[in-house]
């Protein structure tokens, strides 16, 4: 009698443990935040869009938070430059004709909030001075102007290093142009994202390695890409102004959680 009782008791314990273990199992398999950044609600069971897998993990941290993809980076380039300063392991001597500005690369604390589901806005928004997007290496993109009142970039271009970047006064290294280090071997690759959530590609098309002939005034157009098989609006780097993007085609996010604009 005692043996039968113990067997029934043991079977009951095993059954309870099995039910509990099934009930508490986790299904999450990707980097998702709980939305504590106060940048909007939304499902936390959202997978990163395919294009964001191209970000270089050594230099960026990419995850979903509410309605945003968040890209964290220090903004330092993954290549050599005279702007590292003499004595730095990544220091490079200035190339011929370069006019080095007095600034030195300094690590930043960037947190780009990029709309998870970008959409075309009813009107175009002007890009501000400062970061307007981020490259897959974590270096920010700046617009086509050198300063307030739409100062042309012409006088700053000689200060670009070999890979077309330079730092501003606080050491923020950035690209106004195509990031040459990324596109040297593939001029059609995805090079980053605008703050409005739309991808930015190199100067040529992935389908034929030709320069696009139908870009709009913002350097963008729509069709399928390797990362967006069903098609998407996207920008292309060009050798003439606006170089990367001439404005935000979509509703844009922010840098370091400064708000979400729905113009």
Give short role names for the model-derived ranges.
Residues 2-10:
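Bacterial N-terminal signal peptides that target proteins for export
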């Amino acid at each position: 009698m005692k043996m039968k009782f113990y067997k029934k008791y043991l079977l009951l314990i095993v059954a309870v443990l099995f039910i509990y273990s099934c009930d508490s199992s986790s299904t999450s398999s990707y980097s998702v935040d709980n939305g504590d950044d106060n940048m909007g609600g939304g499902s936390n069971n959202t997978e990163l869009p395919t294009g964001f897998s191209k970000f270089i993990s050594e230099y960026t941290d990419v995850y979903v938070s509410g309605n945003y993809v968040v890209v964290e980076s220090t903004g330092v380039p993954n290549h050599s430059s005279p702007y590292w300063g003499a004595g730095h392991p990544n220091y490079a001597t200035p190339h011929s004709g370069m006019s080095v500005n007095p600034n030195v690369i300094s690590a930043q604390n960037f947190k780009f909030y990029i709309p998870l589901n970008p959409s075309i806005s009813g009107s175009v928004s002007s890009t501000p001075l400062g970061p307007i997007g981020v490259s897959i290496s974590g270096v920010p993109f700046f617009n086509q102007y050198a300063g307030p009142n739409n100062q042309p970039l012409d006088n700053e271009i000689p200060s670009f290093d070999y890979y077309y970047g330079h730092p501003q006064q606080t050491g923020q290294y950035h690209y106004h142009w195509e990031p040459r280090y990324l596109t040297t071997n593939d001029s059609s690759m995805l090079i980053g994202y605008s703050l409005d959530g739309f991808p930015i590609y190199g100067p040529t098309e992935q389908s034929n390695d030709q320069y696009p002939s139908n870009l709009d005034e913002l350097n963008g157009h729509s069709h399928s890409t390797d990362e967006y098989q069903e098609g998407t609006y996207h920008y292309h780097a060009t050798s003439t102004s606006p170089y990367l993007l001439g404005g935000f085609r979509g509703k844009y996010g922010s840098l370091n959680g400064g708000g979400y604009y729905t113009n």
